[in-house]
Amino acid sequence: MQESTENGCHMSEQVFAKAVEFGIWSGALTFNISGGEPTEHPNFEEFINLLNVRLSNVYTEFGRPLFTIESNGEWARDVRKTNAVKRVLKHKMLAGFQVSSFKGLYKNYDFIQKYKNKIKALSPRMFIADEGIISMQDLGRASKTDNPAIRKAISENRHNVSCLNGCLVSKQTKTMKELSFGLAKANQHCKPFVDWKGNVHWSESICCPSYGNVVTDDFETIWQNLKKAVPCGTCSLFKNLKESKDEKLVLARMIMGI
């Protein structure tokens, strides 16, 4: 539901349904719903209901797929949206609902802190992420910001490109289902990423390359494109991968041919 903000572009039901089917076809064990702010989508609850019903009838050899929702918590200011969230929290296929708000990065940080306990009390599946920046990565949009906290976090990041695991594991697996299980074992639950247009990315940003579209391309073609993909080298973290002397990363470069 990328760019799902008051002034942004919303994912259509056709794209959402196709994205869900792509995830099921790929053997995904976790479906992460994010944005923009997903609760700003005019059909937020309807889409989540659709997802919950669809996943209720899916079984894989590695377990039943669940879904999570990532939000900034702005819905807590609105009674109608809060009631919608309360209903969504009751869905049996929901693994967790995370509200993220970091000091210096989110305008609503003070508001979330004020009502933090009330928000958490809505459900045992409600989580608040507000302890620093776990991993701020330059995915294109972040590199254009003037926010000093974000710029500092990016410059000090010693991690590698966000697409690395996907690009690497896909070259060592035969099927998309095998890949999905491998990524789940590596705690990579948010890739590949489908944006609001239906484009599929190996990272979490629409600024990153697309390897197909869930509406216009058949899923096998998308998988083959993902399998051929290598880091494009556009974001600043590519330097960490390119220059690292770590044996595992040297091997990773050899496998990917970079």
Positions of PLM-derived features:
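Canonical Radical SAM [4Fe-4S] cluster-binding loop centered on the CxxxCxxC motif
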Residues: 1-14, 204-207
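Short cysteine/histidine-rich metal-coordination sites, predominantly Zn2+-binding motifs
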Residues: 10-20, 248-257
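Active-site beta-loop-alpha junctions enriched in small/polar residues
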Residues: 36-38, 72-76, 102-104, 131-139
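Short, aromatic/basic amphipathic alpha-helical patches
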Residues: 53, 81-90, 110-123, 146-149
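Catalytic-core regions of glycoside hydrolase
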Residues: 85, 89, 97-101, 113, ...
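A C-terminal junction/extension of Radical SAM enzymes
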Residues: 117-210, 251-258
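Flexible mid-to-C-terminal extensions adjoining Fe-S/redox cofactors in radical SAM and related proteins
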Residues: 204-258
